[in-house]
């Protein structure tokens, strides 16, 4: 199912950087997506390309593709989220999708969940360097009781293909409030995963399932999302 009635991104204003003055490596779509926060997006790109690569979070082959395959395609998922809601990012890694989402949507309150110490330390550094007051980090695994207690119940739980769909639902849906959603970035095989893992999704409390794309006006390849509503 393709959902075309997506939520407009609140607060997006005229990009502060004329296209002719953007750094050569910054695509025009970044100015349209991040608006007044473009400088933060550029700083995050620089951090991933340098510090993130040195620390082993980003492979050398991914550096030329950071904007299109990582930052922009994560930032556009905000199109599927209402204004002012709470979001948890499961298995955040180097901050994807949580950091681009936070930059594009400063109205959201975002919790990054990451089990590895070196990555959670990096996330804390990025949050401080970019001045992202709407973001916090919890070190741990989403399925741990202590993490669930810290997070509480949020409106949306997001992730970026960190596990098969059934397992991902078992980690994500318990963090969402009843009526809330998990919204995961997935690829072309998502329909097969839905059929294969239908029982696991139901057991995790999942109900209505939607598959749709976002970013069609900005990206050459729109981002595919699966949304599962928590019903119990």
From Swiss-Prot:
Residues 1-24 are annotated as: Disordered. Its EC number is 2.1.1.-. Keywords: Cytoplasm, Methyltransferase, rRNA processing, S-adenosyl-L-methionine, Transferase. One of its GO terms (molecular function) is rRNA (guanine-N7-)-methyltransferase activity. InterPro entries: rRNA_ssu_MeTfrase_G, SAM-dependent_MTases_sf. S-adenosyl-L-methionine binds at residues 91, 96, 142-143, 160. SUPFAM superfamilies: S-adenosyl-L-methionine-dependent methyltransferases. GO terms for cellular component: cytosol. It is found in: Cytoplasm. Its main location: cytoplasm. The keyword Repressor does not apply. The keyword rRNA processing applies. Belongs to the methyltransferase superfamily. RNA methyltransferase RsmG family. Specifically methylates the N7 position of guanine in position 518 of 16S rRNA. This is Ribosomal RNA small subunit methyltransferase G.
């Amino acid at each position: 199912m393709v959902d075309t009635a997506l939520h407009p991104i609140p607060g997006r204003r005229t990009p502060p950087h004329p296209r002719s003055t953007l750094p050569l490596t910054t695509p025009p779509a970044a100015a349209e997506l991040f608006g007044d926060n473009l400088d933060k997006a550029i700083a995050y790109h620089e951090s991933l390309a340098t510090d993130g690569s040195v620390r082993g979070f980003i492979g050398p082959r991914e550096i030329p593709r950071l904007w299109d395959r990582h930052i922009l395609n994560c930032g556009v998922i905000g199109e599927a989220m209402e204004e002012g809601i709470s979001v948890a990012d499961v298995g955040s890694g180097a901050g994807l999708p949580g950091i681009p989402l936070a930059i594009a949507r400063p109205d959201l309150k975002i919790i990054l969940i990451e089990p590895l110490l070196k990555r959670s330390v990096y996330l804390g550094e990025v949050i401080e360097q970019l001045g992202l007051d709407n973001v916090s980090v919890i070190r741990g695994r989403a399925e741990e009781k202590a993490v669930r207690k810290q997070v509480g119940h949020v409106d949306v739980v997001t992730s970026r293909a960190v596990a098969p769909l059934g397992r991902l639902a078992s980690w994500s849906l318990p963090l969402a409030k009843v009526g809330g959603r998990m919204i995961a970035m997935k690829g072309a095989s998502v329909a097969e995963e839905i059929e294969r893992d239908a029982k696991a999704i139901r057991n995790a409390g999942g109900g209505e399932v939607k598959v749709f794309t976002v970013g069609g006006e900005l990206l050459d390849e729109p981002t595919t999302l699966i949304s599962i509503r928590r019903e119990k």
